[in-house]
């Protein structure tokens, strides 16, 4: 690989790192909101809201199409995030 290509890759990776930092900040904000909602839940069976999950995924698909983003990719990302937050809520609920 040429020196120029290596430099281009490094520059692009630095941009990705900046985006990753922004994503981490958003995850922190999202987690704070999840914590606020979790504090209102009285029963463990309130953690998984299948209807809400379905609506979220439908909206993400629609928005992804509008932005010309691969809908399979965004579906997988959101599905993974939802699973992660469900596990997070279950873990935190046990400590209530």
What are these regions (language model features)?
Residues 1-96:
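Domain-level signature for soluble enzymes in the chorismate/prephenate branch of the shikimate pathway
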């Amino acid at each position: 690989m040429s020196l120029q290509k290596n430099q281009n890759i490094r520059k692009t990776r630095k941009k990705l790192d900046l985006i990753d930092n922004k994503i981490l900040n958003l995850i922190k904000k999202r987690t704070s909101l999840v914590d606020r909602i979790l504090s209102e839940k009285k029963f463990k069976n309130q953690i998984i809201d299948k209807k809400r999950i379905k609506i979220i995924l439908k909206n993400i698909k629609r928005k992804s199409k509008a932005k010309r983003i691969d809908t399979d990719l965004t579906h997988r990302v959101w599905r993974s995030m939802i699973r992660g937050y469900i596990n997070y809520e279950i873990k935190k609920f046990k400590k209530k």
